[in-house]
Amino acid sequence: MSEASSTPVKTFSIGFEEQDFSELHHARRVAEHVGAEHHEFIVRPDALEVLPTLVEHYGEPYADSSAIPTYYVSRETRRHVTVALNGDGGDECFAGYERYAVMKFAETYHRLPAKLRKHFVERAFEMLPSGGGGRSFFTRAKRFMRGASLPRVERYLRWVSVFDTPDKHELYSDDFKHETAGWSATSWLEPWFVHANGSGLLDATLLADTMTYLPNDLLVKVDIASMAVSLEARSPFLDHHVIEFAASLPENLKLRGLTTKYLLKKVLKRLLPSENLDRRKMGFGVPIGHWFRGELQNFLRETILSQKALARGLFKPEAVRRLVELHTRRERDFSHQLWTLLMLELWFQKFID
């Protein structure tokens, strides 16, 4: 795009003061490399004053915390342009998520004798320390092990869920368990693995993401956040020609070993710095775990531990308190669980009360 344009392409990126979550320097390097007119913006905890606005715009209990930076980068972008391109769909087309490699590795692990997995390997992993944040090696290793021995669909669901089945059993009130007894997330997800028509595990997982996570989370997030500020966001990777081409590729051109987006990275080697292509994917994560232990702790407690919230009858009060206490004492990382409960309660306050 930069090569085809007679004027510098405008690029936009957003970051955080917490460096573990900020990709600004990587975005800046790419912008400089292609000669773009680059714009940056920092999100700080006080930026969460925008939460009531987001709750109103989404109109449902939408709990993807990256809606915050998406809204802000859309607002900043709209000050310069009316239409912007994003990268949504690239991961689902060309296998960009780490979980695709993990699903493949788990197939090999699954071939070990069940007794060896359960009594030695999994027991050893459970002894690893907790905490350290969702991105720490120990947390990720334990999360992998809790799903590795499950059947494919349940394994995938365990790795993408905020609350897995045991967590929900501990959290839900008896009445809410009764109300939801006839439904399972597995039954909602499984048809997409079946519809893969005998394709390999990778293609089946890509299809499941394309038909669930992409339209129900990512596209909702970007569409609402961008249109809230009158910005039109377009996704070139979702052009049907690109999707059809990616679907025709053999799996080993999308995921090779542990290398995600294999073909896409090969093509881009002549265009982008190698340090950008070869680094680990971060995603559009938000340091909500830090914020819940700092500036937003009081707001969190006052919202989800309020008398009104605890009296709704959906969750066991002691289970909600436990999540808050363990997280704020840094004993466990319940960032995403607490964010989900927070957004649900804010939605109740806005639309139900």
Identify the role of each PLM range.
Residues 10-15, 40-42, 73, 85-86, ...:
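Short beta-strand segments
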Residues 17-19, 45-48, 90-92, 99-100, ...:
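Short, solvent-exposed loop/turn segments at secondary-structure junctions
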Residues 94-123:
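A mobile, often basic/glycine-rich helix-loop segment
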Residues 12-17, 33, 37-42, 63, ...:
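Acyl-group handling in specialized metabolite and lipid biosynthesis
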Residues 2-3, 75, 79:
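Short, well-ordered alpha-helices that flank and scaffold nucleotide-derived cofactor binding pockets
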Residues 1-10, 84-93, 234, 268:
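A phosphate-binding catalytic loop at a beta-strand-loop-alpha-helix junction
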Residues 17, 24-58, 83, 180-188:
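A conserved beta-strand->alpha-helix junction
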Residues 66, 79, 83-85, 132-135, ...:
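Adenosyl-5′-phosphate
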